[in-house]
Amino acid sequence: MIPAFSAGSICSSWEKITNKTGRSTWLNWTPPENPDPPSLLLSEAEQKTDLIPSSQKTSLLKIDRIQCTSPIESHHQLSMDKEDDVTHFGYQKVPISEKAGKVAQVFHSVAERYDIMNDVMSLGTHRVMKKMAANATHARAGHHILDLAGGTGDMAILLSEYVGADGRVYVCDINGSMLSQGRDKLLNRGILTNVSYVQADGEKLPFPDESFNAITIAFGLRNFTAKESALREMYKVIKPGGKLVILEFSTPDNTLVQNAYKGFSKIWPKIGKLVTGDESSYQYLVESIEMHPDQQTLSDMIGNAGFGRVRYQNLLNGIAAIHQGTKPRLEPTA
């Protein structure tokens, strides 16, 4: 049972952040002539939208797996060309080329019991936070929403109700196991006609420019290798005036909460071992939270990607935070 929380007990006031601008060159995607067979599902996007290239559309209940001319790195495609180029995988420093594969292994391992562990680790509060994040999009009937790192579909369930029959939610995740869990969950709830599933790299998005009214990413950004690149990709595919909403673990705003939270999170790997039989994956998740940028740093990154009106809302005294940014509307020419 989910504990009851009022908005006031979870969040603090919005904090204004000075905007900084910045854009990147778009990474062009070309669908392969003979893509791998779709592993999972796409709903009836072929009748509802033109965001996915026709050559990549599949039948009802299949996931679109979209690749680019520079293939997504996986644990089958590791490159060690630049051993000096490293990034963090939890506390470990690993070659950049290895991180995507390591993260993939984590989520393949935990996918089946991911939702159960979310409830255990957050004491159910993740559901309240996701509802708040979905509300922050201001999504309405007819909107097209991209849910990045959408995994097991919690955000899609909420957003699909907001956009209605004339809108569409695109659940995009690089991990097929997580998408499979999300597909099954939504099917069990009878959500079929306005959700599409795309297996693709969030750092190289396969959608046309200015496709979406809003983009969400809930508890997924910290797993990206190049967060700045991912944010620039989001800027590229969101419409002018569109909202970016990021829900992520963050830095508690007082020492007492920080120490209590660290103590609680230390037992997550042990709980993970009991519930899923996998301790190491949850050790990574704990470490990835500690290595994630704090509220101000992430706000600056969002601004540097080009978003304006950047702000964040602390939840549970900063244990998590919702960041928002808006893509500026084009100024009318004289």
Where in the sequence are the language-model features?
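Class I SAM-dependent methyltransferase SAM/SAH-binding core
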Residues: 144-205
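A short glycine-rich, Lys/Arg-flanked "PGG" loop and its adjoining helix->strand segment in the class I
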Residues: 228-243
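Core SAM-dependent methyltransferase catalytic element
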Residues: 299, 305-334
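Conserved alpha-helix/loop element of class I SAM-dependent methyltransferases that forms part
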Residues: 113-116, 122-144, 158
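Helix-to-beta-strand junctions that scaffold the AdoMet/dcAdoMet cofactor pocket
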Residues: 164, 224-225, 238-239
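N-terminal auxiliary segments of SAM/dcSAM-dependent transferases
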Residues: 71-104
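Hydrophobic beta-strand segment of the Class I
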Residues: 114, 215-216
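C-terminal alpha-helical "lid/dimerization" subdomain adjacent to the S-adenosyl-L-methionine
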Residues: 98, 247-305, 311
